[in-house]
């Protein structure tokens, strides 16, 4: 065999070594990507498990007629009735406040039509349109001792047979401090 003939021969040995090297790098890259994906997915599951849904339904509703509080019996209770249109929060959590206010079209007193939703002493929503039925409420993070109050300028401004409001405990956050 002559030397020129050896120079033209393919060196298959070096090609397989390069192929093995690139296959090893690809395997390492895929493994790292999968590991990062699993870590991210596990972290998301951990975060969502921290926001625990309420175990028992905890809700309260006032009105329409008869105008009295209707409360779901849950242990421990999440709210306490303070007065007809006022509640005290007994459990930290994420709450849905909902309601409907029906204006009285026959109301002709000097006080302007205004319905206010308060959290403690802070007004969180105001309704002033007396021409149509309006919805009140939203989702709020509330803490033990907070009070929620629905106030009218005059009790005669609304039709009590079509006005109500309520609250539902959606979730108890269990965040680590």
UniProtKB/Swiss-Prot annotation:
Gene name tied to this protein: TNFSF18
Main location (coarse class): membrane
Gene Ontology CC, one term: plasma membrane
Taxonomic source organism: Homo sapiens
PROSITE patterns reported for this sequence: THD_2 (PS50049)
Compartments in which it is found: Cell membrane
Family membership noted in the UniProt record: Belongs to the tumor necrosis factor family.
One GO BP annotation of this record: cell-cell signaling
Its biological purpose: Cytokine that binds to TNFRSF18/AITR/GITR. Regulates T-cell responses. Can function as costimulator and lower the threshold for T-cell activation and T-cell proliferation. Important for interactions between activated T-lymphocytes and endothelial cells. Mediates activation of NF-kappa-B. Triggers increased phosphorylation of STAT1 and up-regulates expression of VCAM1 and ICAM1. Promotes leukocyte adhesion to endothelial cells. Regulates migration of monocytes from the splenic reservoir to sites of inflammation.
Designated name of the protein: Tumor necrosis factor ligand superfamily member 18
Topology in the lipid bilayer: Single-pass type II membrane protein
Domain of life: Eukaryota
THD domain span: 47-170
InterPro entries the record matches: TNF_dom, TNFSF18, Tumour_necrosis_fac-like_dom
Keyword Glycoprotein among record annotations: yes
Keywords for the protein's UniProt record, in alphabetical order: Adaptive immunity, Cell membrane, Cytokine, Disulfide bond, Glycoprotein, Immunity, Membrane, Signal-anchor, Transmembrane, Transmembrane helix
Record-linked PANTHER family: TUMOR NECROSIS FACTOR LIGAND SUPERFAMILY MEMBER 18
Topological region Extracellular: 49-177
Subunit structure: Homodimer. Homotrimer.
Cystine bridges: 58-78
Spans within the Cytoplasmic topological domain: 1-27
Any one GO MF annotation of this record: identical protein binding
Glycosylation sites: 129, 161
Tissue specificity note: Expressed at high levels in the small intestine, ovary, testis, kidney and endothelial cells.
Membrane spanning stretches: 28-48
Keyword Membrane included in the entry's annotation: yes
Induction: Up-regulated after stimulation by bacterial lipopolysaccharides (LPS).
